[in-house]
Amino acid sequence: MQEFTNPFPIGSSSLIHCMTNEISCEMLANGILALGCKPVMADDPREVLDFTKQSQALFINLGHLSAEKEKAIRMAASYANQSSLPMVVDAVGVTTSSIRKSLVKDLLDYRPTVIKGNMSEIRSLVGLKHHGVGVDASAKDQETEDLLQVLKDWCQTYPGMSFLVTGPKDLVVSKNQVAVLENGCTELDWITGTGDLVGALTAVFLSQGKTGFEASCLAVSYLNIAAEKIVVQGMGLEEFRYQVLNQLSLLRRDENWLDTIKGEVYE
């Protein structure tokens, strides 16, 4: 498997602007802090540009969308495009909400660095048949052959963009590369916000100069490996959640953590 460059220690305490939902806000803030960066969450149109202009990466999560938040998202995305600020868009709930799907497609004009979603969300976004309900992926949507071909075509249209598709096997697709990543554990599905956290960690690695492809691979693998280290039979939900955040701060001290990434990268 391709050797990625270790992003640690974080070279600068970057400011990561997360426009996210209220449910996962605290987890994302703590996750970003655990990696050595600083979070800020501002989604009021009156101040959103003040914070975006100070940030080194922008993470947009469509959970809990409102008319005011949509206005702020469009303002921040436009600035990110004009200033070449790395941007991650998490397409939460596009399987169900036509408003969210339309917004994500509009955001493509602002050239996001990474589009993230689960298997059902990304299939819905690119026009493939899907069975997603609410914000959850369906087990029926795990076929990847048709999805990979469509994503490759989209990356030709948007050559600077990568897709991060989470599932039992995580996919990362760019114009020239495909990664199939196999770390992780089912316990991550026990607690809300872990998918959102992957997007925030992707923004962290983008702030350190990583490409969209490499930042996506590093982010999803980092969280999955951290979770693998703490799986203990009989552990309760709250303890597991606490230990996930705890391990995020500890794993970066392991100079060999990249060696535990499972999967393949194809040109």
Swiss-Prot record:
Its EC number is 2.7.1.50
Reaction catalysed by this enzyme: 5-(2-hydroxyethyl)-4-methylthiazole + ATP = 4-methyl-5-(2-phosphooxyethyl)-thiazole + ADP + H(+)
CDD domains for the chain: THZ_kinase
Binding sites annotated in the UniProt record for ATP? 116, 166
Keywords assigned by UniProt? ATP-binding, Kinase, Magnesium, Metal-binding, Nucleotide-binding, Thiamine biosynthesis, Transferase
Q: Which cofactor does it need?
A: Mg(2+)
Instruction: Note the SUPFAM superfamilies from the entry.
Output: Ribokinase-like
Annotated substrate binding sites: 41, 193
List the lineage, top down: Bacteria, Bacillati, Bacillota, Bacilli, Lactobacillales
**Metabolic or biological pathway:** Cofactor biosynthesis; thiamine diphosphate biosynthesis; 4-methyl-5-(2-phosphoethyl)-thiazole from 5-(2-hydroxyethyl)-4-methylthiazole: step 1/1
Q: What protein am I looking at?
A: Hydroxyethylthiazole kinase 2
Sorted alphabetically, which InterPro entries does this protein's record hold?
Hyethyz_kinase, Ribokinase-like
Q: Which GO terms describe its biological process?
A: thiamine biosynthetic process; thiamine diphosphate biosynthetic process
Pfam families noted in UniProt: HK
Which species does this protein come from? Streptococcus pneumoniae (strain 70585)
